[in-house]
From Swiss-Prot:
Catalytic residues (positions): S121 (for autocatalytic cleavage activity), K158 (for autocatalytic cleavage activity)
UniProt family annotation: Belongs to the peptidase S24 family.
Catalytic activity annotation: Hydrolysis of Ala-|-Gly bond in repressor LexA
Entry keyword set: DNA damage, DNA repair, DNA replication, DNA-binding, Hydrolase, Repressor, SOS response, Transcription, Transcription regulation
Entry EC no(s): 3.4.21.88
Residues in coiled coil: none
Subunit structure: Homodimer.
Enzyme class: hydrolase
GO molecular function per UniProt: DNA binding; serine-type endopeptidase activity
Function recorded in the entry: Binds a consensus sequence 5'-TGTTC-N(4)-GAACA-3'; some genes have a tandem consensus sequence and their binding is cooperative. Binds to the promoters of a number of genes, including lexA and splB. Represses a number of genes involved in the response to DNA damage (SOS response).
Record's protein name: LexA repressor
Cysteine pairs bridged by disulfides in the record: none
Length: 200
């Protein structure tokens, strides 16, 4: 069983390794968690290795076990999605990226897909222009951020809300207005994570 700190370190290693393809160095872990020396980080890494969670890549780097790395899969990216004014959704996958669902504690990767964000209507939710929104095909709840098809013509990424019992799409930027569907709103995916590509 892992301690809370060990879980945090393992999650950080997963995140970095998923984004870069290589795990962080011991010094990077030290800086990220604010340790005064590398020894504190090393103690946690050795403990994780004893528990079968990590293996030592070289003298300064500890990575995920091969079995966990092999859990990565190709996340389909279905074109672009506007985070400002809605526009037509592209139907064919634009690209695929190697993705580790364990980063977001997800167990059903076959339900996942991604869309690239364009615009600034979700900046208060820290979703920026150029990021990849990771979405899961499942039922949405009020308050979820969703990819939604509006009136069978336009797709956008917004927060789902209800006004007088009717669904609306709420931006996370005060400069944008609510989107109120005239006829139909189809939830295409629920936002479950972000792969940051934009500069922060």
């Amino acid at each position: 069983m892992l301690t809370e700190k060990q879980e945090a370190i393992l999650d950080y290693i997963r995140s970095v390794q998923a984004q870069r393809g290589v795990p962080p160095s011991t010094r990077e872990i030290q800086r990220h968690f604010g340790y005064e020396s590398q020894n504190a980080a090393m103690n946690h890494l050795r403990a994780l290795a004893r528990k079968g969670q990590l293996h030592q890549v070289d003298g300064a780097t500890w990575g995920l076990k091969v079995s966990e790395v092999q859990g990565h899969f190709e996340l389909p990216i279905y074109g672009t999605i506007p985070a400002g004014v809605p526009s037509m959704q592209e139907q064919q996958p634009k690209e695929t990226i190697t993705f580790d669902p364990a980063v977001f504690r997800l167990r059903r990767p076959e339900r996942l897909w991604g869309l690239e964000v364009h615009g600034d209507s979700m900046i208060d939710a820290h979703i920026l222009d150029g990021d990849i929104a990771v979405l899961e095909r499942r039922e949405a709840k009020p308050g979820d951020i969703v990819a939604a098809l509006v009136d069978e013509t336009t797709t956008t990424l917004k927060r789902l809300a209800y006004v007088k019992g009717k669904p609306v799409l709420k931006p996370e930027n005060a400069r944008y207005a609510l989107i109120v569907p005239k006829d139909r709103l189809e939830i295409q995916g629920v936002f479950v994570g972000l792969i940051g590509r934009a500069k922060r």
